[in-house]
Amino acid sequence: MGVIELHGLRKEYRRIRGGRTVAVDGLDLEVPDGGVFGFLGPNGAGKTTTIRCVLGLVRPNEGSLRLLGADVSSGLAGVIGKVGSIVEQPALFPRFTGRRNLQILGRIHRVGRSTIDGVLERVQLSERADDAVRTYSLGMKQRLGIAAALLKDPSVLILDEPANGLDPAGIVEVRELIRSLGAEGRTVFVSSHILSEVQQTADQVAIIARGRLVKAGPVHDVLSAGRARGLIVKVADVPAAVRLLADAQIPTVVSGDALSVDLPPDQAERVTRVLAAGDVYLSELRPDEVDLETVFLELTKDEGLGP
């Protein structure tokens, strides 16, 4: 049984000029307990709408939802205390200090000073806790939002596009925080359209497009669904290797200190034979890495959902 379970989830919206838009289209999804789960797709894929349905912010037209084993189709009263979330941007008071922001929320959740100090330390904001939030970087504001979501010590943390709009330093800060939260045994559900970032963070992923599930599973398995783009070859004598491969009519491009060979991985032995015949020996031979962005484009194209 998953921590989050969706079966046949569908959400439609009425258009102003008539007709209906389908935001989520019969989505089936199961999120396992513990670790970081990446919920991926382009802008407009239905990620935020799905999260809003899970959190009870909007009601789906069809389908069932279970959160922490409880049916939440009609409300989250039984589990809301175990779930923390940020949907889009965290709601903060910019003129107040970071600590004051958490104290206001702490009254709602009935938590004391020690809890507030603990979450500030957890997100590495203790040294800036008494500065006004308006002086924070975007990454710091996002970390403060995550601190607010941690006040209830939730077992499930749902973050909608937490790296959106951040500079590289802020992205790294949030990435490391998400990783560490997942390592603590929490389930961290992260939606994003930045596929390369989630690849560095998530244990499992689901890819959606146009409100429909395209692929789900452990990151390694999803990456395996992509088609390798070729081979990476490293040798001591690059010019000699280029000549030998060209003579064998094997397309090759020099990329730094490596060669990018346009052959599928199952023809790696052919490359080895050609180079060895010319007394050029390999220091490295491996498939060209397939990333989540490549897999996403391939899978959505196969499903007729791509551009």
Pin down the residues of each PLM region.
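C-terminal coupling/interaction segments
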Residues: 1, 265-307
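Generic beta-strand hydrophobic packing signal
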Residues: 9, 27, 283-285
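Residue-level "edge-of-site" marker
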Residues: 119, 133, 257-258, 288
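Short loop or secondary-structure boundary microenvironments that flank
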Residues: 69, 109, 235, 265, ...
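ABC transporter nucleotide-binding domain
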Residues: 175-262
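ABC transporter nucleotide-binding domains
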Residues: 2-4, 11-209, 215
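Short glycine-rich hinge loops at helix-strand junctions in the catalytic core
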Residues: 124, 249, 279
